[in-house]
Amino acid sequence: MNNSSLPLVLVSHTLPDGWLDNLENHCRMVIGPKDANELSTELENFLPEAEGLFTLLTINVNEALLSKTPKLKVVSNMAVGYDNVDLDACTQRGIPVGNTPGVLTDGTADLTMAIMLAAARRIIEANLDARQGRWKTWSPTGWLGKDLRGATLGIIGMGQIGSAVAERATGFGMKIIFSDPDPDLEKAEGLKAKHVPLETLIKDSDFISLHIPLT
């Protein structure tokens, strides 16, 4: 829409077709390049008129940026986390900040299991052997790997993602132990997961999966 009466929203990155259709009906948009690590020069030129900012986690919404946006009314951060957004600075200006909690829980848990399976079954090593011509014939112990069934998985951080990993690992017949500073023991019981000190987890686990913030 080019109606100048509609609010101006800056979208930091080019997104797949159709993702912005609903937004397009309610505002004017200026959209940045696909792989931007910072706000493009073109978008910076529109900051004084912007009423909305739609960002990805590579864009720092900090004091320096906010000082250029006197009309800004909302920040929407397309990420579960919001470390890239200065919440205090936004709060002082009365600017609400939105994010997308939970959107990556299943995908991250699936990827965790995929990595664990690849490591346990030495899939990457075997694949490289086959591709590089080193594999010659079958062997009863060639790239044998390790069973997940019966192995102990230690999860550090039993939040949404850690719990989703536990659900999947239980289906593989793994024993689940976890360490968390504020454990939900009732939820853990439902997942057949045992809370243990971190030192015990490190000592007793066959696999360890971390699901905690960097801080």
Language-model regions: role of each:
Residues 28-29, 96, 118, 122, ...:
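Residue-level detector of anion-binding/catalytic polar loops
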Residues 1-98:
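An N-terminal-biased, well-structured beta-alpha scaffold segment characteristic
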Residues 25, 138-215:
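Rossmann-like dinucleotide/phosphate-binding beta-alpha-beta segment
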